[in-house]
Regions:
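Nucleotide and nucleotide-moiety/phosphate-recognizing core
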Residues: 2-158, 163-181, 188-189, 195-202
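Short, intrinsically disordered C-terminal tails of secreted or membrane-associated proteins
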Residues: 214-217
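Cationic, low-complexity basic patches in intrinsically disordered or flexible, solvent-exposed regions
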Residues: 205
Length: 219
């Protein structure tokens, strides 16, 4: 398999409680929004099928989906978190396997998918990357039938990913990569850091930031 054989499911809930506003449409330093950056990079990586699993009815979501040729599905049950996005996305997927990716990970390296693909076989339902022992369920491969378990769990009131995953056949795959690839934009501070990194990447001479470990100050 290659990325072209997968569906990319972008999980884009709308609560953003820690951000204080809808982070999906926050402008990044390069002029894109957080969500449009993920969709563009996914399309560039070679995914032919993209599902945008989002919460809420917003004109911007419809326009974004149309711009990147994505199929927009909205969560049937609001405020159910990423579990609902996974369930809705897998129900809409037409391929056997999908990459589920959080819409707030602006630096994810789509080449990592090639490391996961060899594990997607047999009875395995989820290929779950781990980083320093921590699961990365919003950057994992899911077999289409895993969506039924997510839908059933939500129906009985369980929406924690860890609980649902323990009921599936999971293949964990430790990765030795830069933790920044899984960086989430969840807070205003994280947003500022992401914008700074993107701006720095566009400079001919990147600005070096050095922080003192004791005081946290830097130059």
């Amino acid at each position: 398999m290659t990325p072209a054989d997968l569906t990319l499911i972008v999980a884009a809930g709308g609560m953003s409680t820690r951000m204080g506003e809808d982070k999906r449409f926050l402008p990044m330093a390069d002029g894109e929004t957080l969500l449009s950056r993920t969709l563009r990079r996914g399309r560039t990586a070679g995914f032919r099928a993209i599902v945008l699993a989002a919460e809420g009815e917003r004109r911007e979501l419809t326009e974004l989906a149309a711009a990147y040729g994505a199929h927009l599905v909205t969560d049937d049950r609001p405020q159910q978190g990423p579990a609902a996005a996974i369930a809705a996305g897998l129900a809409a997927a037409e391929t056997e396997w999908s990459l589920v990716l959080s819409g707030d990970m602006p630096f994810y390296d789509f080449d990592l998918v090639r490391a996961l693909l060899p594990e997607a076989h047999g009875a395995v339902q989820v290929v779950l990357p781990t980083l320093a022992g921590y699961w990365q369920p919003l950057a994992a491969l899911y077999r289409r039938d895993a969506g039924q378990a997510f839908a059933a769990a939500i129906a009985r009131g369980d929406r924690k990913l860890g609980i649902i995953l323990r009921g599936l056949t999971v293949r964990e795959l430790p990765l030795a990569v830069d933790a920044g690839l899984f960086f989430n934009v969840n807070t205003p501070a994280a947003y500022r850091l992401a914008c700074g990194r993107i701006a720095n990447e566009g400079r001919e001479r990147p600005i070096l930031s050095v922080a003192a470990p004791a005081s946290g100050t830097g130059k």
